[in-house]
């Protein structure tokens, strides 16, 4: 029996997992690292801390697993996307990484849009332009840290830096390259037009390969330090969004999944990028060669739920204690009936991406009366998040048909949300056994395919559905009326959101 090691190099830390080739989870370990905020809109992490966490979690799962280490065939990483990691020709790190959440490069966004129209950028990259994309951060570094820019041999992504430490190779994959604002999503090559417009040298960008590319064996001295066999192959891997698609079992055209965590998104699998005329959705490059995953993403899904729990019940972010609060709130929701006077919640606590892409939008409760209770507001929050997801689904369905949807992510532990999402979306949903392991499963699948243990159809061994939920027919008509009011309310408040953003209290 062969084994596969996967790492989910996320925003809060690195999670290592060990799977058997038949899909069984053998061991897992997590180690966190610090995030730095050196100025307004600036968010950084130390890649050396990523490496320390990677080494720690690797050591811990090897100690937990009672297996012959020589049977570990491959390793792959799912990495946080849109980071920039500058290294010199020897692979030496030159500064802390500017990570995905950093928005300092707004100036570079304006400069690029002055040269290339937004619609042309969307056609080339498959995405709306954002200061979070790696290419804009590289342009910022060239302007404000020119010495560092000149000394940089390659600008890497998060997972690519760990791969460099393991193998000595400078490389990235299609899924990460697509989210740089420098890559042509149709030809899967660097866009000389966009690179030139930003004034960046293409020689400073790594070669791009399929996610399942074999980078070779771990360097002997590194393998010895980690306790891994030097025969263990390193497979290039993918960004976390792409890995989640694989780990959700979305590996064939038409497969669709919904991730419901702090943020949320709906992705479906296609043979071509989906270029929406209103630019409401974006397209990613899949780990399955030749496929894409058009997606619509919202900012504050589980975040809305955490906010309302903290505000009304004093229970904060979604950690271990949430298992109890989910059950408690589910019980209250089951015991209560929908109030005769409906409340609408617009879930825009952090602005919004899909489908309206409005950073000025804000969270809003409409229709409160003195007879409403706390639990009525909780219900409205769940409904509001679900309705925004329906709006995203409609944006996708204008271009392609969508059937059954698999739902993953920590928030889906709520029984009420499962039923409500199915009913409001009007779709049958399925829930897999390991709702929290999608990115790890995706990285493991990519490793196994890359080393030849199986092909992507083996995902059925890793992703096993344990629940199927149908829409509640008698509730759908009421929800359709509310959904219409939900969209009308947003449009009615657009100007108010914009003007409110200009009001600052001293």
Model-inferred region functions:
Residues 63-100, 128-134, 163-184, 207-210, ...:
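Short beta-strand-loop/turn "lid" adjacent to the catalytic site in phosphate-handling enzymes
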Residues 27-31, 206, 467:
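Structural signal for short hydrophobic segments within the conserved structured cores
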Residues 1-95, 123, 151, 223-224, ...:
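N-terminal glycine/serine-rich phosphate-binding loop of ATP-dependent small-molecule kinases
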Residues 16, 84-87, 96, 268-269, ...:
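Short glycine-/acidic-enriched loop or helix-start segments at secondary-structure transitions
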Residues 23, 46, 75, 102, ...:
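Residue-level signal for inorganic ion chemistry
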Residues 5-6, 106, 113-128, 136-171, ...:
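Active-site core segments that coordinate phosphate-bearing ligands/cofactors
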Residues 206-214, 321-328:
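Short linear loop/turn motifs
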């Amino acid at each position: 029996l062969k084994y596969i090691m996967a790492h989910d190099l996320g925003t809060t830390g690195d999670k290592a997992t060990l799977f058997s080739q038949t899909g069984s989870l053998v061991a897992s370990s997590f180690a966190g690292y610090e995030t730095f905020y050196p100025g307004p809109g600036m968010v950084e992490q130390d890649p050396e801390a990523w490496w320390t966490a990677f080494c720690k979690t690797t050591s811990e799962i090897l100690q937990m697993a009672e297996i012959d280490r020589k049977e570990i065939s491959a390793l792959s990483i799912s990495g946080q996307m849109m980071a920039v990691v500058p290294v010199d020709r020897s692979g030496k790190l030159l500064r802390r990484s500017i990570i995905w959440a950093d928005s300092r490069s707004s100036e570079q966004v304006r400069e690029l849009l002055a040269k290339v129209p937004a619609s042309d950028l969307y056609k080339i990259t498959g995405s709306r332009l954002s200061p979070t994309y790696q290419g804009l951060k590289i342009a910022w570094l060239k302007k404000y840290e020119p010495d560092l820019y000149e000394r940089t041999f390659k600008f890497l992504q998060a997972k690519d830096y760990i791969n460099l430490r393991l193998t000595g190779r400078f490389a990235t994959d299609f899924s990460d390259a697509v989210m740089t604002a420098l890559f042509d999503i149709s030809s899967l090559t660097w866009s000389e037009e966009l690179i030139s417009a930003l004034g960046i040298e293409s020689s400073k960008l790594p070669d791009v390969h399929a996610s399942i590319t074999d980078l070779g064996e771990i360097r002997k001295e590194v393998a010895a330090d980690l306790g891994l066999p030097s025969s263990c192959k390193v497979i290039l891997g993918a960004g976390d969004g792409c890995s989640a698609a694989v780990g959700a079992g979305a590996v064939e055209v038409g497969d669709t999944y919904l991730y419901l965590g702090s943020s949320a998104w709906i992705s479906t699998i296609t043979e071509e990028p989906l270029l929406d005329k209103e630019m409401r959705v974006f397209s990613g490059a899949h780990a399955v060669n030749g496929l894409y995953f058009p997606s619509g993403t919202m900012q504050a899904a589980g975040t809305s739920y955490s906010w309302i729990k903290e505000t009304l019940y004093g229970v904060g972010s979604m950690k271990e204690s949430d298992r109890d609060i989910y059950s408690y709130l589910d019980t209250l929701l089951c015991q209560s009936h929908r109030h005769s006077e409906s409340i609408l919640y617009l879930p825009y606590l952090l602005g919004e991406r899909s489908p309206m892409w409005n950073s000025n939008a804000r969270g809003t409760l409409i229709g409160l009366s003195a007879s409403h209770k706390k639990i009525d507001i909780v219900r409205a929050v769940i409904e509001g998040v679900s309705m925004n997801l329906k709006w995203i689904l409609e944006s996708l369905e204008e271009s392609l048909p969508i059937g059954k949807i698999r739902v993953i992510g920590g928030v889906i532990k709520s029984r009420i949300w499962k039923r409500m999402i199915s009913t409001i979306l009007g779709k049958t949903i399925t829930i897999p056994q390991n709702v929290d392991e999608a990115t790890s499963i995706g990285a493991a699948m990519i490793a196994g395919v890359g080393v030849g243990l199986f092909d992507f159809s083996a995902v059925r061994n890793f992703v096993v559905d344990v629940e199927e939920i149908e829409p509640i027919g008698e509730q759908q008509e009421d929800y359709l009326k509310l959904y219409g009011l939900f969209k009308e309310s947003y449009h009615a408040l657009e100007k108010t959101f914009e003007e409110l953003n200009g009001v600052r209290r001293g």
